[in-house]
């Protein structure tokens, strides 16, 4: 399982202590233990000791921001692939994480999950980088590659990307605009 793989690579045990989602009864690829399910994610912080929060709600404001903000204020490390949240509130949340002496990790929200931030931070730390040019957006890269390889239209490939989960089903604007 992925859990075991992570435990082997990191040498750390993973204990899922709480899960929250809009719909508890939605069909998923895994079972949710009803004892650790919270319909209101903010209540998790009142009743559980959490080391890391994984946020994947996908909104820039509202509950996404409130959950991440609450976690950071409670000295909980945060991992999020939420592009919209980081684009709009990244500076504020980074400062809050720094103030709380915890990590805010969001590399999966940048460049289609390519570890570009770590590469720039660690491997190119002595270089002065003024600009980065290129398409650093996984959805757009997929669509352009697929259009070229299959000779299908943009709309058809976008629908395919949405079915595969590469682009949001309702409004893929954020996925396409980076």
Predicted regions and their residues:
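N-terminal glycine-/serine-/threonine-rich beta1-alpha1-beta2 phosphate-ribose binding loop
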Residues: 1-73
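Residue-level detector of short coil/turn "hinge" positions at structural boundaries
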Residues: 14-16, 78, 104, 154, ...
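General beta-strand structural signal in soluble alpha/beta enzymes
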Residues: 37-39, 54-55, 78-81, 104-108, ...
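Rossmann-fold NAD(P)-binding glycine/threonine-rich loop
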Residues: 59-74, 81-121
């Amino acid at each position: 399982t992925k859990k075991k793989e992570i435990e082997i690579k990191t040498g750390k045990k993973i204990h899922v202590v709480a899960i929250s989602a809009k719909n508890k009864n939605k069909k998923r690829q895994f079972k949710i233990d009803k004892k650790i399910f919270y319909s209101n994610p903010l209540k998790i912080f009142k009743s559980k000791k959490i080391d890391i929060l994984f946020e994947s709600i996908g909104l820039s404001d509202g509950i996404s921001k409130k959950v991440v903000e609450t976690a950071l204020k409670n000295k909980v490390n945060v991992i999020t692939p939420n592009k919209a949240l980081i684009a709009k509130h990244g500076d504020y949340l980074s400062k809050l994480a720094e103030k709380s002496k915890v990590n805010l990790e969001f590399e999966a929200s940048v460049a289609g999950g390519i570890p570009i931030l770590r590469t720039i931070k660690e491997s190119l730390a002595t270089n002065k980088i003024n600009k980065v040019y290129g398409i650093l957006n996984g959805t757009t890269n997929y669509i352009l590659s697929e259009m070229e390889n299959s000779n299908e239209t943009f709309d058809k490939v976008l629908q395919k990307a949405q079915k595969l989960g590469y682009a949001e089903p309702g409004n893929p604007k954020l996925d396409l605009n980076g």
